[in-house]
Amino acid sequence: MTLSINALAHIAIELQMGLSNQDRFQRLINSLRQLLRCDASALLRYENQLFRPLAIDGLAPDVLGRRFRLSDHPRLEAIARAGDVVRFPADSQLPDPYDGLIPSQEDLKVHACVGLPLFANQNLIGALTVDGMDPCQFDHFSDEELRLVGAMAAAALSNALLMERLERQLPAPVRAESPAAESVEEMVGLSEPMQRLKKEVDIVAGSDLNVLIMGETGVGKELVARAIHHGSSRANHPLVYLNCAALPESVAESELFGHVKGAFTGAIHHRTGKFEMADNGTLFLDEIGELSLTLQAKLLRVLQYGDLQRVGDDSSLKVNVRVLAATNRDLRQAVLDGAFRADLFHRLSVFPLSVPPLRERSQDVALLAGFFCERSRAQLGLARLALTAEAGALLEQYDWPGNVRELEHAIYRATVLARAGQESGEVLLGPEHFNLELPSQPIHATTGSPVAIDTVPTYFISGGLREATDDYQRRIIQQTLVRHEGNWSSCARELEMDSGNLHRLAKRLGIK
């Protein structure tokens, strides 16, 4: 046996010393470098037909944010389907998911690869991968020795998943494989602000409280709302979305509460309002601060008594709806200014959540970049998509005034630009593919808060402000349409716009 008892005991001790799951996982991975003398390793969690990295060593930081769908990565699929150690020959025709993801060596190909599927009660829960640059790097380790390492990793991961379910008071992981769970987008981030937010989401999801989600544009408030809904007892009922900022005053009441036939000119049939659609489920009211005071009063009544009146109907209708509201405005100040009802504010903000801007969680930029790189790779049908070290450094230094949404758009746009000069299907993103200008010395506004200058991409500066604004809107709409394969409804949803308003804007900009 090549692996000594002392070496295995060292791993066991390291796993016990970790203060958190993340710390334990990283200690395990770090120990593998000494134990197996590997150049790269990763501990992966299996969920919904994909592998999610939990800890890595020797790989680019953005790997932690990537999500490896089995159907896109045949080596990982082979590991998932195997019941034992998998050794890939150096000349294997199956592409390695980590090719191009070795820091500062983007063109380096992995030569030796071993995969260990991890099981708990005969259910696949994850995988351990070890890689090396020498084709014979792991030949002197027997399958039995590697199984021992895999068993220790499986025990650590299984215990962590069990504790996670107990802390969140979730049922067994059968639910995680449901179609509804597959559609839930993940809240990516390991920074302290995001860990705190995730804990708060877990806490409030199990209740039936109304939640006010606050944060700047582009931070992911809708993502938080979805996480709350899918972690609640209402998860099997509808989550209905309404952007209050896109509601014309003339139809806002009908959108919220519905109307009966003949209620007003043009009401040629009955219409079900968003509250009825969300009965027994959740209603997400985005940009709640844009509602008129008149509608705020009617919304308050529904929240207080659970009954509503359709426009043109004298009878009341009982509904059971949980309301999640979001805003990028300071509603406390709006209350003081008389623009928002104090009683509605207190009714909505029973459990307020604040979503941190990206500049306050810069640790997550690399993870998010990897997440969006993998998504862009899949959407554009690329074999490989990676960031150079210089591009990664640029992304981490940029201030991201548009937050996560701006980062997503920047990655996708850079991928489209870089792909234009490639024929192999393997794309490497460098700084030249990003229109990002790092801020120079900040100036200070009269409030004393720093205001960065020279942060506007150079291609926005030519022409007048209207022309630059139109050009920016045109680019964003076109990129979003490409991502959604020309689906205007999906495009409008991502851009948080009313579908009709989007069509009108697209016509004015010459897109339609």
From Swiss-Prot:
Q: What does this protein do?
A: Required for the expression of anaerobic nitric oxide (NO) reductase, acts as a transcriptional activator for at least the norVW operon. Activation also requires sigma-54.
Q: In which pathway does it act?
A: Nitrogen metabolism; nitric oxide reduction
Question: From which domain of life does this come?
Answer: Bacteria
According to UniProt, the name of this protein is Anaerobic nitric oxide reductase transcription regulator NorR
Q: Which NCBIfam families match?
A: PRK05022.1 (NF003451)
Source species of the chain: Pectobacterium atrosepticum (strain SCRI 1043 / ATCC BAA-672)
Q: Does the keyword Repeat apply?
A: no
Q: Where is the Sigma-54 factor interaction domain?
A: 187-416
Gene name?
norR
Residue ranges the UniProt entry marks as DNA-binding:
488-507
CDD domains (alphabetical): AAA
- Entry's Gene Ontology BP terms: phosphorelay signal transduction system
Q: Does the keyword RNA-binding apply?
A: no
